[in-house]
From Swiss-Prot:
ANK repeats: 12-41, 43-72, 76-105, 107-135, 139-168, 170-200, 203-232, 237-266, 270-299, 303-332
Protein name: Putative ankyrin repeat protein FPV034
SUPFAM superfamilies: Ankyrin repeat
Gene source species: Fowlpox virus (strain NVSL)
Domain of life: Viruses
Keyword annotations from UniProtKB, A to Z: ANK repeat, Repeat
Keyword Repeat: yes
Length: 415
């Protein structure tokens, strides 16, 4: 094939065109294009693609003036508009759109590429031409989700102004992701102000479960202040935020939860309350925190176990001594028991220590002998022993009070 004017074969003409483009000799470019019968070829597209990547606005306009089909796509399905967005060239993108470049409103690659550059003008331009701001990618994530991941406060606010939907979720909601770290607190506050569901459970957990597990104290408090349910349970397992805080040894999170109404005796699906976890961890801090705030140690799970089973199995002298002392204090103070059988089971468990390690047992209950309390307190729960204990305590107040002070019991909370 020859051109009209030059009488040259097409390959030679294409070569001359490429050289003229490289030299940015736009006069020659126009002359060659004028003489070519068909400029909507892959070779011409490739020339223009390079022009877009090199931000050559003049060449783009020349091709458009010569009626080049700007909606041609290459072998991977990319149009010139897609390349303009990829190189973040708003001017070329506008030229193409004004010239009739077609936008697939559900082309997530186009929008998400613009989001990568965080260019508000480009996103504004795409929205003006009908892009779906809430289109999901093949993983189910939207532009807003990726912007949140980048912790870009201004861009999040911008997308929300463009009606980005905060309720779209995949495996985790946007609020679940924000709950993973304190650094997202500003963006979290924006979404909460927009009314995102603070108690949404996606997959297994609610946002407060995630915040507590990650020891995100600020996020935990922010969620609570926006009416997050501190006692909401996992979809599978039935654990509450307090269960999780203790499991992860996040003391401050546990303290915040309890101070904001967390149920210290909430059961999971197998009947374990938070104190079961504290006992299994052999952590006296959590044992004391829970018991000081009214947790019941005389409780059994579906396997018939009490927290004391775990205390003794763990073998921590400090935790065992604290637990023994606490159980004895319940009897001394004549606390009303919710599950007398569980209490009896606990006392029998402790009494067995005497058979396995008498010396250790004597260390645990040495203070009890100092009170001159009857030994039967460990094994016999007849009412007559209550009167004996109360009588002994009243005659040995000077010894009893220092003991209580040593373990810092707060029995008004226990009741």
């Amino acid at each position: 094939m020859k051109t009209k004017m030059f009488g040259l074969h097409e390959p030679i003409c294409i070569k001359l065109l490429e050289q003229a483009i490289e030299l940015k000799d736009y006069i020659v470019v126009r002359m060659i294009l004028n003489q070519q019968e068909n400029i909507n070829t892959y070779k011409h597209f490739n020339m223009l693609r390079k022009a877009v990547l090199n931000h050559d606005h003049n060449l783009v306009n020349i091709f458009i003036d010569k009626n080049f089909n700007i909606n041609i796509a290459d072998s991977v399905g990319y149009t010139l508009l897609r390349y303009a967005v990829e190189v973040d060239d708003v001017n070329i993108a506008k030229i193409l759109l004004d010239a009739g470049s077609i936008i697939n409103k559900n082309d997530y690659r186009l929008l998400h590429s613009a989001i990568t550059h965080e260019n508000k003008k480009m996103i504004e331009l795409l929205c003006l031409h009908g892009i779906n701001i809430n289109v999901k990618d093949d993983k189910g994530y939207t532009a807003l989700y990726y912007t949140i991941c980048n912790n870009n406060y201004d861009m999040v606010c911008f997308l929300l102004e463009k009606n980005a939907d905060i309720s779209i979720v995949n495996k985790y909601s946007m609020l679940h992701f924000l709950s993973t770290s304190n650094k997202y607190h500003n963006v979290m506050a924006v979404l909460l102000d927009k009314g995102i569901d603070v108690n949404i459970i996606n997959h297994v957990k609610a946002p407060i479960h995630v915040a507590v597990e990650r020891n995100n104290i600020y996020g935990t408090m922010l969620l609570i202040n926006r009416n997050a349910d501190v006692n909401i349970k996992e979809l599978h397992g039935g654990r509450t935020s307090l269960h999780l805080a203790i499991k992860e040894r996040n003391y401050e999170a546990a303290f915040v939860l309890i101070n904001n109404g967390a149920n210290v005796d909430s059961f999971d699906d197998v009947g374990n309350t938070p104190i079961f976890i504290a006992a299994s961890l052999q952590d006296v801090r959590f044992m004391k925190l829970l018991l000081d705030n009214g947790a019941d140690i005389n409780v059994r799970n579906v396997f018939g176990e009490t927290p004391v089973n775990m205390v003794i199995t763990g073998g921590s002298k400090e935790v065992t001594q604290y637990t023994v002392s606490y159980l004895i204090s319940l009897k001394v103070d004549n606390i009303v028991l919710n599950d007398f059988c569980a209490y009896k089971q606990n006392m029998n468990l402790i009494h067995r220590i005497n058979y396995g390690s008498p010396r250790l047992f004597m260390e645990y209950i040495g203070d009890i002998y100092e009170w001159h309390l009857p030994y039967s307190v460990l094994t016999d729960d007849k009412p007559i022993n209550y009167s004996k204990i109360q009588s002994k305590v009243s005659h040995n107040e000077s010894r009893f009070l220092p003991y209580k002070k040593r373990y810092n019991y707060n029995n008004t909370l226990i009741q």
